UniProtKB/Swiss-Prot annotation:
Pfam families: Mito_morph_reg
Compartments in which it is found: Mitochondrion inner membrane
Keyword terms of this UniProt record: Membrane, Mitochondrion, Mitochondrion inner membrane, Transmembrane, Transmembrane helix
Name of the protein this chain belongs to: Transmembrane protein 11-B, mitochondrial
Organism: Xenopus laevis (African clawed frog)
Chain segments annotated as transmembrane: 79-95, 102-119
Gene Ontology CC terms: mitochondrial inner membrane
Membrane topology: Multi-pass membrane protein
Amino acid sequence: MATWGRRRAGPGGRERVALAAGECYIVHEIYNGENAQDQFEYELEQALEAQYKYIVIEPTRIGDETARWISVGNCLHKTAVLSGTACLLTPLALPSEYSHYVSLPAGVLSLACSTLYGISWQFDPCCKYQVEYDAYKLSRLPLHTLTSSTPVVLVRKDDMHRKRLHNTIALAALAYCMKKIYELYSV
């Protein structure tokens, strides 16, 4: 864990800045009775809805589940973007008689991933967060008070541009697929 004060290694020799009181919430791993896991989930849900900049999840099980949920959302987003891009760029790279064998499935995959992301993740408060792995950013957090050695740290990020990107690419892929299907079956 990094020390308070001036950072010796890393880009620019930035100084450590203390966080404001309302920027970080810690879900502590304190077992008080049989419903401890439910209490952890409730605390996490409240912290997500309160939109803290950083959320530190100390309980291992709920931290791992949250990190997995976020990584599945990230995978759907990346798959939608990459397959949509492949759908749109394949006709430029392959001969026209073969391009639809790659571009149509890629377009359908992009649309499916974008739709699934929109249905499952769009309204989930967890989609606004990413798991933080950067040691410098983690050193700014009050992790010295934790009892767990492997907490999951979530950082709130604006995902508006991300959603616009994958929705735009998926819609462009849909338009291309509709045009290509019309051309294939109208001839």
